[in-house]
Amino acid sequence: GDGKELCQIALARSMQTGDYISGYYRDQTIGVAVGDLTWPQYFAQLYGHPDINFDPHSGGRQMNNHHATRWLDEHGEWKDQTSRINSVAGISSTAAQTPRALGIAYASKLYRERPDLTEHATLFSKGGQEVCYTTIGDASTSEGMYFECINAAGVLQVPIIFSVWDDGYGISVPIEFQTTKSSISKALAGFQRNEDGKGLEIIEVKAWDYPGLLAAYVRAAKLAREEFVPCLVHVIECTQPQGHSASGSHERYKSTDRLAWEHEADCNVLFRQWILENKYSDESTLKAIDDAAIIEARKHQKDAFAAYMSSVDVDRKAYLRIAKNLLDSTNEPSLLEPIIEELNQVSYPIFSDLVKAGRKTLRAFRFYQGPAVKLLRKWLTDLEDKNRRRFSSHQMSESVHSPLLVKEVKPLYEKVPQQVDGREILNQSFSNFLEDPRVFILGEDVGKIGDVNQTLAGLQDKFGPLKVTDTGIREISLVGQGVGASMRGLKPIVEIQYLDYILY
């Protein structure tokens, strides 16, 4: 988030309880500003601490800055989404945060426009007033799925705010090689709503202009929340003071003039000047805040690292105790000491180093029996089981709602079964599903003509266009629409018309 802090603070101030953020890996300022992320959690994720008490966002399974609200409780039941701001798990596949944001916003539309969902909305919506914010860097707006979702949002008129952090580069590639007219807001100008029809509200604002940023997000949030007008907030003149990543400094590809401008025009520098010029604070107070922040950050970093290493150290010490017992009972130092020495040479061992040492020790003492070897084998088995829980559990639901626990219902046939087309069976099955208010179907040609294969024939007339909904040819945003809506307690059925379309 370096160089994008101020716009993220302004965005956060426009959010309300029940809103959603579907962002990417530069949004830590938003997470902290809305109270969804603490600095101890930030550093715990940096070190990959596989304990949700330290890293509740991912339990050490995601890269740093991939923040996520916990949507389910320990029993696999939904938590109340209306009483907090909700963060969808951050993602590194650039633009992939956008399709699911479309679905989250679409759920607000359904909760507002379908009274039959009222009793199901308790944990998910208060009258459909929730806005979904989604963020992206300027270079990633070139991804096809981004354009697809922009178009879908304009068609659907859903409460979504697209934010673009524009620092003029995609790693080393400048914007003139990325975006038509070197500006995503200019390139998308045809989507601007006007007397010709509905569309998006497009707002351009500078990354260092705090009053302008506040006004932009207040305006966008009001339009999205009250009128269901999708908005694009294009934040220009962002900086990237640390370069794109650890792969190299931005000094490799930015001109001397550009580097000098970034030093002077960084949002934090100009924000500080604005505070002082308007006498909201003084230099000594701001310096005290700076100094305290550095001390606090270093403390949280050290504490997080110590907490992570202590979790490893418990198993490391257990291994060393067993190794000593093994040495005492076998008197074979030549077999064991090289393994221990190799482990001790690892400055900061992780769990895989312990597994590696344990397996090497078992192989070295494969011809020995006795309590010490059995204890080592049990320790290794237990450690591998714990590691499976740490790193591989909950890939699918482990609650009572697991699909693997659904009991099979075998078909029953009459003595002389009636022969009907398969599409008729599917049609009746879909009709049965749609009796559940949470279920809806969307896809290409599913509505008016009832699907190209007639499996949905007559169902739009029976249940209405918000239950069986025609869409454009836009596969990735359809999938995202389903994913996002399902995260808000709904049960979408998304049709990708033909199997080969999934390649899109």
Per-segment meaning from a language model:
Residues 1-7, 241-463:
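Conserved acidic/glycine
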Residues 1-4, 24-26, 60, 78-99, ...:
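Active-site nucleophile and cofactor-binding loops and adjacent substrate-binding regions
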Residues 1-163, 168-170, 174-192, 197:
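Cofactor-binding active-site loop characterized by glycine-rich and histidine/acidic residues
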Residues 10, 32-37, 144-148, 166, ...:
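Short acidic, glycine/serine/threonine-rich loops at helix termini
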Residues 28, 167-169, 209, 235-242, ...:
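Glycine-rich beta-alpha junction loops
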Residues 112, 124-130, 181-219, 263-292:
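Conserved thiamine diphosphate
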Residues 177, 181-184, 237-240, 444-450, ...:
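Short glycine-enriched loops at secondary-structure junctions
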Residues 209-234, 283-285, 336-340, 504:
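Phosphate/diphosphate-binding loops
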